[in-house]
């Protein structure tokens, strides 16, 4: 009985690790980039901004915070970050974060600060915000986890990518290939 339980735990841990690291990805376009409502995102342009991606993220997501450290190291990219909280606490924090900024630059500053400092909080000012719509959009298009990255060419990766894998994916060679 004890060996069976240990085996079951090991199988479950392996499955969780696979989900957390590889998740799902597509190296063939299938997502229609034009379906994205870019005005509902927080935009950042780094370098020449030639490579364009959308990232569905949430301030309470541990893998999203880890992914932000990876995104810091990527150059020549335009990143559209869509706040897509998956639980009520993250929903409130996402709305507070969105409403605390009066423009894209302030929202970007607050988001990056929140990703590096879990204690960062923002005033609970109410405002019109796209957060609920981002969640509905995610459900409609089967974006069920954060972070999820979509390339302008329609390729999609759900889950965290280390820097080398992200760079490989951005170059069109596939996230997990040689």
Residue ranges, per PLM feature:
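Extracytoplasmic thiol/disulfide redox context detector
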Residues: 5-88, 123-145, 165-178
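Thiol/selenol-based redox catalytic cores and closely related redox-interacting motifs
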Residues: 90-167
């Amino acid at each position: 009985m004890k060996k069976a339980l240990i085996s079951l735990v090991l199988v479950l841990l392996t499955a969780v690790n696979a989900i957390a690291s590889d998740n799902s990805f597509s190296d063939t376009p299938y997502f229609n980039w034009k379906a994205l409502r870019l005005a509902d995102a927080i935009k950042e342009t780094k370098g020449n901004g030639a490579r364009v991606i959308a990232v569905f993220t949430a301030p309470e997501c541990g893998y999203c915070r880890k992914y932000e450290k990876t995104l810091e190291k990527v150059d020549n990219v335009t990143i559209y970050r869509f706040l897509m909280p998956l639980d009520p606490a993250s929903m409130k924090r996402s709305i507070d974060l969105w409403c605390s900024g009066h423009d894209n630059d302030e929202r970007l500053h607050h988001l990056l600060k929140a990703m590096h400092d879990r204690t960062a909080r923002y005033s609970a000012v109410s405002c019109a915000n796209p957060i609920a719509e981002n969640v509905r959009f995610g459900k409609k298009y089967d974006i069920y986890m954060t972070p999820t990255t979509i390339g302008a060419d329609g390729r999609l990766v759900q889950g965290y990518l280390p820097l080398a894998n992200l760079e490989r994916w951005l170059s069109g060679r596939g996230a997990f290939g040689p």
